[in-house]
Amino acid sequence: MKKLLTLLVLGTLLTLTACEEKGEVGEYDNWEDRNIAFIDSIAKVAEQNADSRWMILKAYNLGDSASLYKGNRNLFVYAHKQKDGTGTVSPLFNDSVRVHYSGRLMPTELHPQGLNFDKSYSGQTLDEETDVPYLNRTGSYVVGFTTALMHMKEGDNWTIYIPAYLGYGATSTSSIPEQSALIFDVQLARIYHYGYDTDTSWH
């Protein structure tokens, strides 16, 4: 699995480097097309599911008619399960959750792992002993992130790949260009069920 992803990232970087040598492409030039190609390559790895750890999740807001969306890779979230938790239920849209997360853009030559644009902890790496998981409502995130959360269980640790359409789309922020695919490392620490769990304090 790691070998496949390494080859995928290497191919992306080689393409970028070749273009830059010709003076044609900056880090964010042709960004939309490159992000679409990146998600397509991730989708192919997920579809092969060589290590049986991939999940392909249809966006939660598209209803149950999966056949209508078959073949459109921009309507799915691609999740690779890094660690299975011990929880038995997944959060619903109106539930609240505590999560550790780190978000980054697709890999580029300048940022081979992808430029980090946000994370829930202050240090370079997560310290589960001291870092308090971020609290928010399940449905308060972008569609792709919420979709993944609604399939996770407490303790799960996933890497999720979100097409731009299920992220910020044509909207840009100070650290996220428009039409950016998003990559998140997410650990679901706790679920608070709406109308039942009123104490959302940590520990």
Pin down the residues of each PLM region.
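Sec-dependent bacterial lipoprotein signal peptides
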Residues: 1-19
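Cross-family detector of peptidyl-prolyl cis-trans isomerase
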Residues: 19-203
